[in-house]
Amino acid sequence: MLIWLVELADHFQFFNLFRYITFRTGAALFTSALIVFLFGPAMIASLRIRQGKGQPIRADGPQTHFKKAGTPTMGGLMILTGIVVSSLLWADLSSIYVVSTLLVTLGFGAIGFYDDYLKVTKQSEKGFSGKARLGIEFVIAAVAVFFMMQAALSAGAAGSTFGSSVTFPFFKDLMLNLGYFFVLFGGFVIVGAGNSVNLTDGLDGLAIVPVMIASAAFGLIAYLAGNAVFANYLQIHFVPGTGELAVILGAVIGAGLGFLWFNAPPAAIFMGDTGSLALGGLIGTVAVATKHEIVMIIIGGLFVIETLSVIIQVFWFKRTGHRVFLMAPIHHHFEKKGWTESQVVIRFWIIAVILAMVGLSTLKLR
């Protein structure tokens, strides 16, 4: 919204700063962090009163988790408020990529909110029906992917299939054109990303920091992919307009920092599905928009590992009646092995940093 103030640059030189994505990214980060810091305490107090018993604790979970009983959830409302308000202020709302990303973020956030609501009111781990939830998520994601695909096709040269193609790291010219099946592929990527972050959110601070790390990595990717000069130098695919996504990702980092202030152990609030689904969906949408869906598997490798641990556990238990892990997702396995919560969280943060660096290295290895 504030980018329109660039029109005043002829009279007030200061407003020329609003042209630059880097300036607006920094401003978005600061704004979202400030919003969460200022309004966080009031939101936490309100949620604690309204929820009473707070988020239900898994009966089969580690014993150390029972002391968290009564902690309110839906902290994602704080994060989403910071992200959305900051993005509306600093991002270019004429960009279909910005609009699509915010659509997915709010849509997934609403689904997560309803899921949290059911869990709190019923005091049960079972919330929204799994199949129904996945179905609605996929519809939202597919709509966003369709519009982004059309934008990429329109921006490309006549006859170009880039908008409907999947690109691969390490190979600058390798593309797989999926046609309109790209909508299904992109929808799967976004839904998978949302639910992977959701599965990771099981310990204080465990999900939010890797989300910020992935956001920083994809913020750089979005900025580079949206700049013709840098994209040509790195031999990555140029996607006009995606640079604006760096502004949204800056807002994610700022809101994440603000939330971590209250989510640091012992957590005063949990982000809940409201936050984890929305943040995962946001990152997945950026990956699709910038044509780095495969790279997301590396950068978001921690989320992939958490998801695979659940899939393996369920598959093997149904097949043999035995468990591969003491408990899934895998962060609970390590707790059962004797690791303290802080050891699990910090070691997983380290893994997230390493994976993000490996993912970014693919930009130059072509």
Swiss-Prot record:
Primary site of residence: membrane
Keywords: Cell cycle, Cell division, Cell inner membrane, Cell membrane, Cell shape, Cell wall biogenesis/degradation, Magnesium, Membrane, Metal-binding, Peptidoglycan synthesis, Transferase, Transmembrane, Transmembrane helix
Domain of life: Bacteria
Subcellular location: Cell inner membrane
Pfam families in the record: Glycos_transf_4, MraY_sig1
Record field: transmembrane: 27-47, 71-91, 93-113, 138-158, 174-194, 205-225, 245-265, 268-288, 297-317, 343-363
GO terms under cellular component: plasma membrane
Membrane disposition: Multi-pass membrane protein
Record EC number: 2.7.8.13
Biological process terms in GO annotation: cell division; cell wall organization; peptidoglycan biosynthetic process; regulation of cell shape
Coiled-coil stretches noted in the UniProt entry, renumbered to this chain: none
Catalytically driven reaction(s): UDP-N-acetyl-alpha-D-muramoyl-L-alanyl-gamma-D-glutamyl-meso-2,6-diaminopimeloyl-D-alanyl-D-alanine + di-trans,octa-cis-undecaprenyl phosphate = di-trans,octa-cis-undecaprenyl diphospho-N-acetyl-alpha-D-muramoyl-L-alanyl-D-glutamyl-meso-2,6-diaminopimeloyl-D-alanyl-D-alanine + UMP
GO molecular function terms noted in the UniProt entry: metal ion binding; phospho-N-acetylmuramoyl-pentapeptide-transferase activity; UDP-N-acetylmuramoyl-L-alanyl-D-glutamyl-meso-2,6-diaminopimelyl-D-alanyl-D-alanine:undecaprenyl-phosphate transferase activity
Cofactor(s) listed: Mg(2+)
Pathway field: Cell wall biogenesis; peptidoglycan biosynthesis
HAMAP family named among the record's database cross-references: MraY
Family: Belongs to the glycosyltransferase 4 family. MraY subfamily.
Described function: Catalyzes the initial step of the lipid cycle reactions in the biosynthesis of the cell wall peptidoglycan: transfers peptidoglycan precursor phospho-MurNAc-pentapeptide from UDP-MurNAc-pentapeptide onto the lipid carrier undecaprenyl phosphate, yielding undecaprenyl-pyrophosphoryl-MurNAc-pentapeptide, known as lipid I.
Protein name (record): Phospho-N-acetylmuramoyl-pentapeptide-transferase
Classification of source organism: Bacteria, Pseudomonadati, Pseudomonadota, Alphaproteobacteria, Hyphomicrobiales
